[in-house]
């Protein structure tokens, strides 16, 4: 082993790589899924076991409008004693102020674990984000993902997630997002499917009005990916991705398998 290590120091420097041009780098950054340069995921899907996850992450500005609060939940309402807890990894991909050094850093992160039937909350002060613009990405198991963007001027909305079976064979479900206008002005909300060809919806809410948005997942066998924005507030957005778990086996993500095309325009 020592001889192999010593001999390795005399080997040629690897040269079996391609140096990318500026235009190729730009192409990859703009549309990595369509890039002919990057390695490709093998196309197609495979059977995927049911998992006893019933996870919810919702976020809102606190009453003083000085912090963004995320509530993490691993519910046991659907699976009872078989329900699973979950790890959550949360990133601030932009500049976030280190409380020890008081300097801005990128890719700050926090790890959480929530046991079955439990929930927890955590808050981040807005002044710790550069320019007061918060941006948090939440990663959970099996493709679970949430993204929160905004600032102190977020619209006064209540967003509560849930899901149910679609009435078929219980393999797929309907993601339900209850949207309530807590302000004293009219709000117009747009919900856009990013991957699974469900198009766009516009929801107009009078002051105090509450309406549900239902996102079907039958085309994608439980997988979903959609973004919510509010007219007149370019900083605010919420993104919801993952797979609805209903106790039945499904398939791996058809977007990852190249059977759907992503659209984030």
Q: What is the meaning of each model-derived region?
A:
Residues 1-265:
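Membrane-interface soluble catalytic domains
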């Amino acid at each position: 082993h020592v001889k192999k290590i010593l001999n390795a120091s005399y080997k040629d420097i690897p040269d079996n790589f391609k140096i990318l041009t500026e235009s190729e780098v730009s192409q990859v950054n703009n549309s990595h899924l369509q890039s002919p340069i990057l390695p490709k995921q093998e196309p197609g899907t495979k059977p995927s076991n049911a998992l006893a996850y019933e996870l919810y992450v919702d976020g809102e500005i606190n009453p003083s409008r000085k912090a963004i609060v995320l509530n993490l939940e691993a519910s046991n309402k659907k699976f009872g004693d078989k329900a699973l807890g979950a790890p959550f990894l949360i990133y601030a991909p932009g500049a976030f102020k280190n409380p020890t050094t008081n300097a801005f850093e990128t890719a700050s992160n926090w790890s959480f674990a929530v046991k079955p039937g439990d929930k927890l909350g955590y808050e981040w002060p807005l002044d710790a984000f550069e320019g007061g613009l918060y941006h948090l990405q939440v990663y959970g198991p099996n493709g679970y993902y949430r993204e929160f963007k905004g600032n102190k001027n977020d619209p006064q909305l209540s967003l509560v997630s849930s899901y149910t079976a679609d009435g078929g064979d219980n393999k797929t479900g309907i993601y339900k997002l209850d949207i309530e206008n807590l302000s004293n002005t009219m709000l117009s909300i747009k919900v856009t499917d990013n991957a699974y060809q469900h198009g766009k919806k516009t929801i107009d809410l009078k002051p105090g009005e509450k309406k549900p948005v239902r996102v079907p997942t039958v085309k994608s066998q439980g997988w979903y990916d959609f973004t919510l924005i509010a007219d007149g507030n370019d900083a605010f957005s919420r993104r919801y991705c993952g797979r609805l778990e209903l106790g039945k086996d499904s398939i791996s993500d058809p977007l990852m398998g190249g059977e759907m095309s992503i659209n984030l325009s």
